[in-house]
Amino acid sequence: MARTSKRARRSSPLHIPSAFELFTPSKELVLKNIWIFGPLYAVPFIFWIHSWIWSPLPTQHVHWWGHADTLSAGWTGSPLPTYGTFLVVGFSLLWFILIAVAGTIVQIMTQAAQLDAIERRPLTFDSLWDTVKRLGWRLVGLYIVMGLVIGVGFLLLIVPGLIMLRRYFLAPYVMLDKNTGIREAMDKSAELTKLNTGAIWGVLGVMLLFGLVNIIPIIGGLASFVLGSLYSLAPAMRYHQLKRMS
């Protein structure tokens, strides 16, 4: 019987695998290049640990270090002395600046590494840093514009925000790959994601699913982080697949 389905065969370069099918190849590339992705993913993990340590206990509205006097004689009954509280405020401000700067740099390097890994290009920190110097400010502008557009969409109604998220999901990879401007990257992302909207929704759905693992007590946060890290190349893979279709 003649083949009547319009879907591409699995052996075809135009075949789009399901979002879950991307987990294994993504995991393999992450582990193969762990000397690059390991340090890059360690940075947000450190940020997460810091956030967890300084978050209030859910039932008592104090930080965990408020009970540290039971752990060491070096701690007083009060969480911190008055001068220490001011140090914490200053430290928090410095930490915010550190997160803004280091987090953005790591974000750019990570997305560049993801794209290079998919394209089978050699990964080095020198080349990733060159990408930051070459496209850093442009990508920062793209992140800001994307954040504003998607944020306004969610403020108006949830649905427009989701649509904007889907449309511009691949914009950073377009800019990294094609060296485009902000508007061109967003327009190209909208064009690519329109080729197969389900392929983008699928990846977003799996990412959300892994994020929900965080609600599991005790181990949920770590499990969510590990699963998300192993699946992190899926967006770059989708970009590569849809680019071949265009």
Predicted ranges, named:
Residues 2-246:
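Hydrophobic alpha-helical membrane segments
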